[in-house]
């Protein structure tokens, strides 16, 4: 399986609490709910396409509990996202037991989750997908194990909050595999990581790379 990270994000790189102001107030974040006023049919199509590649979900505990509090109530058999989240295999990175809601489809990964993720990647299938789970996504990004990055980029600046990229991650040059613009100006991006390429300059007859 390939490992993909799938996130809603703002222009200033924030992925915290896209749905509602109360969704995630950690760190004193008060500007949640920034995505929903702009979420349109094109956004829904993009998310449905993300889930069309899913073989299993890899979630942090916060996101797992948030999903468990919402998605079991969505019972429309034609809802691809709900069907995958409710019925598909889920791996959650946590040090404590999970509830009974999805007990039959959930496997708990402990502190050695990076080794377990590498094992899961070696298995046949589509994608092992991370949704939300910012701290988990950060750890996977820093470890250099992400194969695909997908973003639904909202034309919003919130001025603070948690996001995927920090100053301690690898330098990458991304290759665009797909991009679409929705009716409300959101951009759905699919990117694959590659070796960082900096600009070059000729100094004293020698080419220097930055």
Indicate where each model-derived feature is located:
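Portal/gating segments that form or line small-molecule/metal binding sites
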Residues: 1-148, 155-210
């Amino acid at each position: 399986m390939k490992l993909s990270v799938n996130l809603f994000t703002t222009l200033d790189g924030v992925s915290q609490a896209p749905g509602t102001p109360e969704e995630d107030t950690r760190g004193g974040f008060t500007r949640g709910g920034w995505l929903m006023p702009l979420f349109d049919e094109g956004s829904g199509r993009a998310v449905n396409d993300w889930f069309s590649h899913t073989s299993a979900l890899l979630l942090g505990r916060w996101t797992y509990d948030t999903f468990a509090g919402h998605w079991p109530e969505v019972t429309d058999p034609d809802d691809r996202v709900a069907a995958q989240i409710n019925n598909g295999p889920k791996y959650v990175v946590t040090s404590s037991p999970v509830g009974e809601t999805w007990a039959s489809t959930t496997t708990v990964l402990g502190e050695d989750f990076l080794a377990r993720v590498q094992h899961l990647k070696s298995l046949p299938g589509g994608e092992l997908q991370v949704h939300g789970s910012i701290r988990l996504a950060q750890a996977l990004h820093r470890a250099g194990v992400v194969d695909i990055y997908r973003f639904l980029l909202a034309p919003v600046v919130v001025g603070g909050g948690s996001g995927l990229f920090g100053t301690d991650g690898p330098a990458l040059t991304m290759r665009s595999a797909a991009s679409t613009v929705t009716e409300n100006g959101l951009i759905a991006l699919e990117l694959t990581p590659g070796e960082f390429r900096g600009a070059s300059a000729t100094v004293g007859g020698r080419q220097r790379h930055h």
